[in-house]
Amino acid sequence: MEIRNVKGTKDYLPEEQVLRSKIKRACEDTFERYGCKPLETPTLNMYELMSYKYGGGDEILKEIYTLQDQGKRDLALRYDLTIPFAKVVAMNPNIRLPFKRYEIGKVFRDGPIKQGRFREFIQCDVDIVGVESVMAEAELMSMAFELFQTLNLEVTIQYNNRKLLNGILQAINIPTELTSDVILSLDKIEKIGIDGVRKDVLERGISEEMADTICNTVLSCLQLSIADFKEAFNNPLVADGVNELQQLQQYLIALGINENTIFNPFLARGLTMYTGTVYEIFLKDGSITSSIGSGGRYDNIIGAFRGDDMSYPTVGISFGLDVIYTALSQKETISSTADVFIIPLGTELQCLQIAQQLRSTTSLKIELELAGRKLKRALNYANKENIPYVLIIGEEEICTETVMLRNMKEGSEVKVPLSSLSNYL
């Protein structure tokens, strides 16, 4: 038998997982600072739920992992955390609104594999249900900037409004049944360019005349400000989209983050579920060209799940932990899981007690040499593990209630009283 991972999956060894855990903690801390509550949903779901018409459209349906249980029920692994969240709200009508939740968990997509993108990956999501105002979007965008500032990553956020985009297509007489196809093509304009968009819409069965109209419209829109779209397109959807975008922009200015955002009139986020604001997050340095976070407003999913066709205003944002890890691993030295490594020299029993005492009286992470290695080999291990401090404890140290403290970065040693050790670390 060949021992190997499934294509698109990866093992993360301890030195890698340290950084991934740091990212997860940063997400949790930031989310909770914004008043979000934790939630956990099943990885395994009914296929009917995950393939629901508001659940992402045909593109995402091709990437769903499906299976059957022993009762012949059609099941699916979740491809995001949004649909399971909407399910929870729909199943629990007594949840107090507004409800702000976060969830960090694995999702699965049988899609293309590229840098920072796998088929099993972790998403870190925040969603707010019960707020109609685009103030919710502004807060989520502000939260994103705070998170990436914590992680020392500089980002920009591109944003748009689906009402604006749908209204533009309506104004140039794109048939309703072709709107989704055109939006999927326009969403790729930064990757494939205007000629690529023309080719893509033609391949989707759109006439040459209509393709020319689409491309000419794109070119004319690129120089427009948000306010200009009302005059350029006499359409009520465009007007609604412009109003919401202008309100959002006012909040972004008030929060001091507008300069790090970019209005992109053809950003669509692909998925058919979005009803208003959409946004994507990109690294400023371009070291990873795909987005490292995204989201938007989806007001119709929960009502559709509940079957009452009521609007449940909902907006969310999602961060890809794996792609953030890829970005950080390119520039950050992997730190150790331990702050202090204790090496006993014939004093194993006493060192066991000292390690326990330090764990219970300080916040230090303590690792004890358990394998009985000689001093040189034990120091070499601590060096390779990037452990900053080593305590060397022999019989003399036990008798004098001291320890030999070695600073691994400086290579210096000093004998200090055990009782005041924390003052030296």
Swiss-Prot record:
UniProt keyword annotation of Ligase present: yes
Keyword Hydrolase: no
GO BP annotations, alphabetical order: histidyl-tRNA aminoacylation
SUPFAM superfamilies: Class II aaRS ABD-related, Class II aaRS and biotin synthetases
Localization annotation: Cytoplasm
Domain of life assignment: Bacteria
UniProt keyword list: Aminoacyl-tRNA synthetase, ATP-binding, Cytoplasm, Ligase, Nucleotide-binding, Protein biosynthesis
Enzyme class at the top of the EC tree: ligase
Gene3D superfamilies given in the database record: Anticodon-binding domain, Bira Bifunctional Protein, Domain 2
Catalytic activity: tRNA(His) + L-histidine + ATP = L-histidyl-tRNA(His) + AMP + diphosphate + H(+)
Name recorded for this polypeptide: Histidine--tRNA ligase 1
Originating species: Bacillus anthracis
